[in-house]
């Protein structure tokens, strides 16, 4: 099956809502509409930027989509500081990131919570981008494939095959995030192929063949071409490079198969 590439720009805790508007305008200017026929492009801003991004995307009828960086497993209630999937859906979000390594590390989120958040996202017709990945010691010990397969199982626990068919998986080796180090294309393919194989066991081979698997970890315009050429890598979860509108547009154009804008 031919899977349409997805380029997702995770802005993390960067850019106020004025800066968000400027960046989306830059991306829109730098990446003409024709590219969106061949690649899906989404930005993942901080919560405080979402309404401004929504207004711009809707007003200018942009084909760019957007999403949230996290959500609560709860719909509403006494959960100070949390954001529900219902709120994100009301803002027009298409995607939401769950289980990012920074959430797992700094907020002690485990696989069970990630699975609950993925289910909450699906309940509100949001596509969860479920993140998994290993630390450097696991990679150096040669246990990276087994680690990611186990984390995938835990992070999708309780989801039906139909629900699994609606998720996106992002493999993000923790040692490569924001470090400038990037897993080689063959290394990324090794893990992404194992992810797809496990999805076949958890759901079905047909569903596994349709689910998009992204690579995340120091993705930029220089390495996206080689990464996305791999059989089981369907795009990128982009960090720092997504804050540069021109580079992000170039990256997306490469993922679309070119030519450069």
Swiss-Prot record:
It is an enzyme of class 5 (isomerase). The keyword Transport does not apply. InterPro entries: Aldolase_TIM (IPR013785), TIM_sf (IPR035990), TrioseP_Isoase_bac/euk (IPR022896), Triosephosphate_isomerase (IPR000652), Triosephosphate_isomerase_AS (IPR020861). Substrate binds at residues 10-12, 178, 218, 239-240. One of its GO terms (biological process) is glyceraldehyde-3-phosphate biosynthetic process. GO terms for molecular function: triose-phosphate isomerase activity. The active site is at 100 (electrophile), 172 (proton acceptor). It catalyses: D-glyceraldehyde 3-phosphate = dihydroxyacetone phosphate. SUPFAM superfamilies: Triosephosphate isomerase (TIM). Pathway: Carbohydrate biosynthesis; gluconeogenesis; Carbohydrate degradation; glycolysis; D-glyceraldehyde 3-phosphate from glycerone phosphate: step 1/1. Keywords: Cytoplasm, Gluconeogenesis, Glycolysis, Isomerase. One of its GO terms (cellular component) is cytosol. Its EC number is 5.3.1.1. It is found in: Cytoplasm. Belongs to the triosephosphate isomerase family. Homodimer. Involved in the gluconeogenesis. Catalyzes stereospecifically the conversion of dihydroxyacetone phosphate (DHAP) to D-glyceraldehyde-3-phosphate (G3P). This is Triosephosphate isomerase.
